[in-house]
Amino acid sequence: FLVLTVGMAVNGGAGAMAPVAIGAALMVMVYAGGHISGGHYNPAVTLAVLIRGRITAAEAVPYMVAQVVAATTAAFAVKYLIGDDKMPAEAVANGDAVKALLAEVLGTFALAYVVLNVATAKANAGNSYFGLAIGLTVTTMAYALGSISGGAFNPAVAVGVSFMKMAAWGDI
């Protein structure tokens, strides 16, 4: 649902409110799926949780595969719903791939930092705010860095937006 929300909000005319819709969608997804899968929707965050030792490699790999497959499927759904002719031309925001990569690394780091400290820290066991913190982090980073990189902060989303022609394959 995350890539579906990204594609529909950005291409469907949400304008400046798109990051709010995307952050809210992620928050809802974390609350809805957190008790089932740990709320793993981002391969970079899954890797961070693996490094922290909260999941095993045998758990992480299927999550990562599912994340990319789901993002790709959602991208094709968006293309069908909106129409290929209404999808944007391939581009990196501001045309500077190095700056875009740095922005993505920083935004992804911020997201992983928040996830590790609100959703996997022993001191926060049983908290009920982690979805809000995670969703607001994505919203904040999208507003702060989105004009530089497009604001994916998630390798699976980056694959999805490439299929939707919102970013060029060579810039992932």
Where are these regions (language model features)?
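Membrane-interface helix-loop junctions and terminal tails of multi-pass membrane proteins
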Residues: F1-I172
